[in-house]
Amino acid sequence: ITTAEPRPTLLNYLSDPYGCIIDMEAGVTEDGIVSGTGPYVATSLVTGEELNLEKNENYWDGEPGFDNVTVLTISDGDTLTMALQSGEIDGAYGMPYASYPLFQNEDYTFSSCATSRAFFAHMNFESEIIQDSAVRQAIAMGIDKERFVDDLLDGNGYPAAGVYPDNFSFGGDAVTAKEYDPDGAKTILEEAGWVDTDGDGIREKDGQTLTIRWLTYPSRQELPLLAEAVQSSLGDIGFEVIINSTADHNSIRVDPTAWDVYASAMVTAPTGDP
């Protein structure tokens, strides 16, 4: 392998599960299928539903373990849990944290590890309401990250200030964040002129309601739960939060007039290199 510049983390990249060697001359089919080097060959793909594979007769590392493999897309966490319990599927990835105890026994092989996955709330600075610094501060102070970790992630994580874990040399306390302080958030909003004048629980300012459109997606099991938690906690301080949890989030996100906050989850340093 020849790189255009020194790349000391090359071996890390090659070991990344998302790292692939693809035959670019073969190209990509209309269905999105590529020619790679893995133990299985994709025979059909229905995006968002099902991927069918058959063993690669020319695999470089011995006989693949199965003749055929079917990969199903199951976005709903409860449905995924029941499918594995009933034997409808043989294995699962991305199980909801709340379901972990059901499979941590001798009947299943269960594997999990800490990663650099972080949950983000991206604020849209092209949105008029997000341009108000008081609104941004109130959102940051009004989301109870500790409770989200404890209750919805079942303790599998910790509240983060930055995008990288504490054990990274470029992470930890390099960034500070607002503490959860709903009363302080209320004070900031009131001082900025956001007041509930009609008693409906939603603040207003100059005829505009304190409404934010929260865009997210359902394929990461915890994101819809985060949206509901935020809707509740920000609702307590006078926000109206309108949730749009959709698989079509990417096409919506390119339109800056269609959302105010975009929530996502991603592994920030899968190879140890930011």
Residue ranges and their predicted role:
Residues 5-64, 68, 78, 182-183, ...:
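Gly/Pro-rich hinge or "lid" segments in bacterial periplasmic/extracellular proteins
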Residues 131-232:
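Append "and occasionally in soluble cytosolic enzymes with long acidic Gly/Pro-rich linkers
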Residues 79-81, 89, 99-100, 126, ...:
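Short, hydrophobic alpha-helical packing/hinge segments within bilobed ligand-binding/sensory domains
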Residues 235-274:
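Periplasmic binding protein-like
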Residues 109-124:
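Periplasmic-binding protein-like
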Residues 28, 56-102, 231, 240-242:
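Ligand-site clamp/hinge motif
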Residues 1, 38-43, 51-52, 67-73, ...:
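Short, well-ordered beta-strand elements
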Residues 101-112, 256-259, 272-274:
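Ligand-binding "clamshell"
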